[in-house]
Structure formats: structure tokens, C-alpha cells
Amino acid sequence: MTRGILIFAFSNEKIDYLEQADWVADRVNTYLDLPVTIITDTKSINGRKFKHNLILSDAISGGQRNFKHTEEGNVGTWYNSNRFQSYNLSPYDETIAIDSDYVVNSDQLLRVFESKHDVLCHRDVYDITGTNRFAPYNTFGKHKFPHYWATVLFFRKSKMGKEMFQLMEMVKDNYTHYSNLYKFSGNIMRNDFIVSISLSILYGHKLDAIPTIPWAMPSAYDDVDLEQLDDTKFKISYTKTTNGEKKPYKSIINGTDFHFINKFALDKVIHA
């Protein structure tokens, strides 16, 4: 039984996703002692050499987006629509597909492999700043459909695992239809929405029957800054409104995985 981590990393005009994935892959080797396969393209590689296993695929655009909501001028192409290929491209029997901005900082993900379920992801997130910025992401669309996160997606090579990614491909190919059905904007393709809808179909639309990773995913929004203090210790900087006044705060993250959405701050850490 082989186990490993899968990361999709297609760079664009603004962010070198492949470089970030390579940095995260090093941390996977250190803290999980697992092999990593990165799905990318020749444009992202750009003549460079990487020590981790690379599989080439044509990048599929999910649309244009601003990669930092708090600033203008960070609009680029979001090549985020290849996730449905995970089942066919993964060389492992059991796989955890993670985003390139998921900072592996412990061995906690190893617990996911112990699950009896063949497909798992996070339903809940925990804002590590305490500002509750992710509350609006608990549901999506006018029908308030439950929001599941594609950031960490575990699957086994099994009948159910295969069906999950077949459903994801179907939802991706018919994204406009599903955006109309679930009443959300279809301008940008979101893997979270694709995973959420696919899980619902997979479990016969019985939402209470959908199993999830049994802990909330620590996360930070794209207006949070980051500094690495040592191997497992990071300092985050952010503003928080107290008594109607915005004030600067700092917190320490130590020995805990976290989803860090500010790609530009993550890039500074990688090059520090």
C-alpha cells in the first residue's frame, strides 16, 4: 500500500506556484516522511530542475481573479481547474492532495490515512487570527449550501474514490449549469464548490452522511503577513478591530499545519 502527497502547481503572471509547491514538498518529506508528486506544466518549470517527482499536464484556467483582495493590481489567471485529474495522475494507492499554500508543519495529516472512509476533506476552518474572516465561507450560493474545502483532499484508489473524481469532472464540465442550480457566481471556477457538489451527489444528497476530516483547518486570510522564526515556528501579523478601532496584532504558530492564503507573504518566507 503506497501513500503520498499530491500538489497541483501551475504558475501564472503573479505567483510562482511551482516554487511554493516545491517548498511545501520539502516540508512534507521532513514532517510526514512521505513522497510528493507535483502536477505542473513546462511553462511553470521554465527550465529549472526540481528534486521532487513532477508529472506534466496542460494547465486549465478557472478564470481571472485578484490574488490579494486588499490590494488592486494583483489580477492574474487562476490555473486551478485540474484537480479532477487527481485520481488518474496520482501514483499512490492512498493520496492526500493539498494546495501549494498549505503549510505542512507537523505530522497531523498522517492521521487521515487511518480513516475507514475513501474520500475526506475539511468542512470546518479555524481562523488563526481570531478575526473570524472565514465565517462567510461556511456556505455558498443563495441556497446556503454547505462549503467543503478542497485544500486538503484525501482519497483511496477505490470505487468510491474513482466516482468522486468522475463527479468532479462532470461538475467542472457543467459548471455554468451548477452555478445556476445552486445560485452562485460562475465567473470563477472554485474547486471548493466542485468538491462540495460532488460530495453531495456521491452521498445521495444526504449531507449528514458526508464524512469529513475530524478537525478544523487552521487558516489565515490574504491580508495576514507571515514571518518564519525557525523550522516550525511562524509569526503572523494582522489587524483586528477592538472597540471600533483597528489595531495591529501578532501571534505565534508553532508545530501546527495551516492554510496561508497570502501567496505574496508566503513567497517572501520562501526567499528569506
Regions found by a protein language model. Give the residues of each.
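A glycosyltransferase accessory/donor-loop signature
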Residues: M1-A9, L18, I38, R48, ...
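Short, hydrophobic beta-strand segments that form beta-sheet elements in well-ordered domains
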Residues: D33-T42, I96, V119-C121
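Short, polar loop motifs at secondary-structure junctions
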Residues: I39-N46, D58-A59, V103-S106, I213
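Catalytic phosphate/metal-binding cores of nucleic-acid and nucleotide-processing enzymes, i.e., regions
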Residues: K43, H117, F145-P146
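GT-A fold catalytic core of metal-dependent nucleotide-sugar glycosyltransferases
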Residues: Y79-G130
